[in-house]
Amino acid sequence: MSKVDRWLLPEGISELLPDDALQVETLRRRLVDVFQRWGYEYVITPMIEFTDSLLTGSGGDIDLLTFKLTDQLTGKTLGIRADITPQAARMDAHSLKRSGANRLCYAGHVVHTRPQVALGSRTPIQVGVELFGEPGLDADIEVISLLLEVLSLVGMPKQYLDIGHVGVFRALTEAAGFSKEQENTLFLLLQAKAATEIKDWVTTHVREPKLQHWFLELPKLSGSAGVLDRARDVFADAPAEVMVALDELSSIADVVQPRYPDAQLYFDLSELRGYHYHTGIVFGAFSPGVGNAIAKGGRYDHIGEAFGRARPATGFAADLSVICRTLNVETAPPNPGVFAPASTNAAQWQEIQSLREAGERVVSGLSIQDAPYDHQNCDRILIETDTGFQVKAL
């Protein structure tokens, strides 16, 4: 690599300069404070783990996103975390071993082998919550409510929440007796919203008229809460699991909408985000003019099985950098500081420390520097007088 190119970062790898770093860190602190006020305990997970535990129960997508290397001490394969959720599940199942509901929150970098969206970062700063141990809908409602609370906190002018339930599609494919390959093919077509291809595939591979009707109507069932009533008519004679899923979606609308009347809840029964990972309610938050979800989550009830302790779970995660960039989160710049000219005077040092303890930002001069640089943002200077030290305006 030439000297000219040594400053280049790998594609998708980003750095945050002071203003952006301050914005992200300020938001991180605000969000973690909110999580803790809701009863979620902050945890810090390791950046690197054995892949045997890091990828357990997380699905093939996370495996492909994970950088792997060989541990020089054991010869085993290590992975750099691409998602903190499986680590939180390991903590819940093995490290903490608590009974009842267990609420955890986290914030930290993850690393991906490739961006998940076009021009996206391979080093997202993931922040999120996980609620373990509660199988009931109360947990899903709490997590969705917390996400809407967060979106309101960061100044999102209008909250758009896309909600689905993987149980609908799963029950229908089981009723149709699809093979794994057929199920995956239809899943991909639904995610692509390829109406013509869906119709062609269904009419070719599904012979029973009733089943054809279900699968052809599925991608059309999206909209406000009223679409759930229409879905009940469409799936009137479908497996009971479908009605259970629709009832859960209705309950979410009945509870969450009054809590957050300004939020727009959008139900999409063909939304299967994380289908191979989630087991029930799934959701994503969107901002006007942004095509990709700025936060997403859902229920995943089997992730703890591999750690010897199956626990129901639900949660959500977001990328702090994306939230800051998308929503232009406002953060107050640091207060102008006090500049202290270079000196080894013990009395000046004591005065500087007193100012810092009082909450002032004090920048000490170095070498022969007798005035602050512009980027140091100081509007006052510490000077020595006959009677002691004084802070004066610059």
UniProtKB/Swiss-Prot annotation:
The keyword Transferase does not apply. Keywords: Amino-acid biosynthesis, Cytoplasm, Histidine biosynthesis. Pathway: Amino-acid biosynthesis; L-histidine biosynthesis; L-histidine from 5-phospho-alpha-D-ribose 1-diphosphate: step 1/9. The keyword Amino-acid biosynthesis applies. InterPro entries: aa-tRNA-synth_II/BPL/LPL, HisRS-like_core, HisRS/HisZ, HisZ. It is found in: Cytoplasm. GO terms for molecular function: histidine-tRNA ligase activity. Its main location: cytoplasm. It holds the Pfam family tRNA-synt_His. Disulfide bonds: none annotated. Gene3D superfamilies: Bira Bifunctional Protein, Domain 2 (3.30.930.10). SUPFAM superfamilies: Class II aaRS and biotin synthetases. One of its GO terms (biological process) is L-histidine biosynthetic process. One of its GO terms (cellular component) is cytoplasm. Heteromultimer composed of HisG and HisZ subunits. Belongs to the class-II aminoacyl-tRNA synthetase family. HisZ subfamily. This function is generally fulfilled by the C-terminal part of HisG, which is missing in some bacteria such as this one. Required for the first step of histidine biosynthesis. May allow the feedback regulation of ATP phosphoribosyltransferase activity by histidine. This is ATP phosphoribosyltransferase regulatory subunit. It comes from Teredinibacter turnerae (strain ATCC 39867 / T7901).
